[in-house]
Amino acid sequence: MSITAERKAEVIKTNAKKAGDTGSPEVQVAILSERIANLTEHFKTHSKDNHSRRGLLKLVSTRRSLLDYVKKKDEARYRALLEKHNIRR
């Protein structure tokens, strides 16, 4: 259900603004989007896994909060994030 360290490093590398950037909202949203996608695939075969569903809702909520922060700071960055990660809003 969680992403591997290699996949996480790859996601960080493709979304980082500079080397060593792991805390920017763009990187955090990318990591959360990857984890959400993995959980969504998990639920296709384990539809009654309500314990993991609660975790999914928490991840979505955290991503939503980060996106709201980015939208408040810079609308263009927000739109780019939505487009890049195919997030509906």
Swiss-Prot record:
It holds the Pfam family Ribosomal_S15. Residues 1-11 have a biased composition (Basic and acidic residues). Keywords: Ribonucleoprotein, Ribosomal protein, RNA-binding, rRNA-binding. InterPro entries: Ribosomal_uS15 (IPR000589), Ribosomal_uS15_bac-type (IPR005290), uS15_NS1_RNA-bd_sf (IPR009068). SUPFAM superfamilies: S15/NS1 RNA-binding domain. GO terms for molecular function: rRNA binding; structural constituent of ribosome. Residues 1-24 are annotated as: Disordered. One of its GO terms (biological process) is translation. Belongs to the universal ribosomal protein uS15 family. This is Small ribosomal subunit protein uS15.
